[in-house]
Amino acid sequence: KNARTVAGEVRQAIEAATGEKVELGGSGRTDAGVHALAQVAHVKTAGKLRREEVLRTVNDALPADIHILSLEPAGDRFHARHTATSRCYVYQISRRRTALAKRFVWWVRRPLDVGAMRAGAALLAGRHDFARFCEKPLEQTSTVVVVERCEVETAGELLLVRIVASHFLWK
């Protein structure tokens, strides 16, 4: 309930840097243990900001595991979640045991058939109703998802499963 969140840390740092209460919205939520790269968010402030100065001040106030890459002006109607046309998830599967990356990858002991994985991933492209794959389909805005692409790539000992879709279902 009172757990530390990325959004909470970012909001607190921005409010300290700007001296005002701000509305902060992200382009999506992440489950516990899921890490976001290049997450887009919006912040509405009362005044004009000196972007470089605020960026430096905010990053100095954030813990080491959170970093803001840039601040960009956006129109009044921009909303990080509602304006986004797609989202991308990357699942990392390790083909060998790894001590340093174990929090970020799924280690599969058995050999994987990458060709079969690629063929299966390609079948996910298109418009599908995923209602059967979520716990509470009635709480979803829509269980119909447009999967732009699903690809399996190799990167050394890692397999990267990259899924780009209109949205993803909550549980």
Where do the language-model regions lie?
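Structured-RNA-binding interfaces characteristic of tRNA pseudouridine synthases
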Residues: K1-K171
